[in-house]
Amino acid sequence: MDKFRIQGPTQLIGEVTIAGAKNSALPILFATLLAEEPVNIHNVPKLKDIDTAIQLISQLGAKVKYNKSVYVDASNIAVYCAPYDLVKTMRASIWALGPLVARFGQGQVSLPGGCAIGARPVDLHLDGLAKLGATITLEKGYVKAYIKGRLRGAHIVMDKVSVGATVTVMSAATLAQGITIIDNAALEPEIVDTANFLITLGANIIGAGSNQIIIDGVTSLGGGEYRVLPDRIETGTFLVAAAISRGHIVCHATRPNMLDAVIAKLRETGAKIETGEDWISLNIHGKRPKAITVRTAPYPGFPTDMQAQFSLLNLIAKGTSVITETIFENRFMHIPELMRMGVHAKIENNTIICHGVEKLSGAQVMATDLRASASLVLAGCIAEGVTIVDRIYHIDRGYDCIENKLRNLGANIERIYS
């Protein structure tokens, strides 16, 4: 497996262009299965998960061309089963099920894989499809959905806020007969982006971005062009990189209004942040950041996908702080690895007590999931000596050319190919 070798410490200074959002691009790619005409999707990030999604929809019979944009023609889908060999690496594969059963009356998806960060069951997805009229069964590791005729609109109240399940129900409901109301829907910008894509294809959706989404089903969806919104988590990751390295980074091609909670917390550290319509600048003027309290929450609260990066920030900051994770269990696997580099932390249930240290030491560490791997790479950039980050296939799942972008900011980082 590939590794990163990082020589630190480095003050990261410069400019970076933010890629398209993984958490928009993936549901949008799977939603192309609903379209009877070709679709062009722009600003798609170059990620391992994107490659997997493209392979999957190609195996189902879609014609796909992937260059700077992704062209999908799903007019001749002939296979309705997403196989284990692809699904095992990516939990997002469950998003194929809703479009398949909505358009073709049947679909099968192997129980999905992805990051090992606790219980993220697909029950909410399946409950939503069942309420739309689909018969759901589990056979030999595959989830199967079936219906005679069209799905039927329904009033669905989500038991808990779930981005993934909101996407599944919203996408499937676009082709259902009648009106579907989703209450307690997720509010994330990526939900709005997916809804806007579906609207481009001819769907009738109102309320995306609020806790109630209303979909008036249509008989078919056409084609169109769409541009994926910028990745707010990649943006936040590079802003943290500037803060922990006592540097200055400007992020371009992003949207500051999607990052209010992250920006507010970074300002608490003492960093100076400036924003424009499509850029954010963080300059901490060579100072050590101040420790801050962080509690993850569904959007518009502090994103769980930024928790690992802010854990690192607090562990090198001035003072003692507490980070509370409310979204996922078992999402502190980066902490034992950071301890190998000299941090002082104590895990108590769903909280981390962080005692900031002034310096980190390079070490050999192992990535355990996507966002944890980002925190380890950033730690290597500011640690004294050499850091080796193993199992970086995790970071390739969610960050577009991260080593090139860090290198352009001054990091001494190289990929060691296996």
Curated annotation (Swiss-Prot):
E.C. number(s) listed in UniProt: 2.5.1.7
Biological processes per GO annotation: cell division; cell wall organization; peptidoglycan biosynthetic process; regulation of cell shape; UDP-N-acetylgalactosamine biosynthetic process
GO molecular function: UDP-N-acetylglucosamine 1-carboxyvinyltransferase activity
Matching Pfam families: EPSP_synthase
Annotated localization: Cytoplasm
Record-stated family: Belongs to the EPSP synthase family. MurA subfamily.
Gene Ontology cellular component terms for the protein in this record: cytoplasm
Record-given protein name: UDP-N-acetylglucosamine 1-carboxyvinyltransferase
InterPro entries: Enolpyruvate_Tfrase_dom (IPR001986), Enolpyruvate_Tfrase_sf (IPR036968), MurA_subfamily (IPR050068), RNA3'P_cycl/enolpyr_Trfase_a/b (IPR013792), UDP_GlcNAc_COvinyl_MurA (IPR005750)
Keyword Transferase attached: yes
Residues given in the record as UDP-N-acetyl-alpha-D-glucosamine binding sites: R91, R120, P121, V122, D123, L124, K160, V161, S162, V163, D305, I327
Residues at the active site: C115 (proton donor)
Predominant localisation class: cytoplasm
PTM-bearing positions, type 2-(S-cysteinyl)pyruvic acid O-phosphothioketal: C115
Pathway: Cell wall biogenesis; peptidoglycan biosynthesis
CDD domains: UdpNAET (cd01555)
Role according to the record: Cell wall formation. Adds enolpyruvyl to UDP-N-acetylglucosamine.
Lineage summary: Bacteria, Pseudomonadati, Pseudomonadota, Gammaproteobacteria, Candidatus Palibaumannia
Class in the EC hierarchy, top level: transferase
Record field: catalytic activity: phosphoenolpyruvate + UDP-N-acetyl-alpha-D-glucosamine = UDP-N-acetyl-3-O-(1-carboxyvinyl)-alpha-D-glucosamine + phosphate
Binding site for phosphoenolpyruvate: K22, N23
Keywords carried by this UniProt record: Cell cycle, Cell division, Cell shape, Cell wall biogenesis/degradation, Cytoplasm, Peptidoglycan synthesis, Pyruvate, Transferase
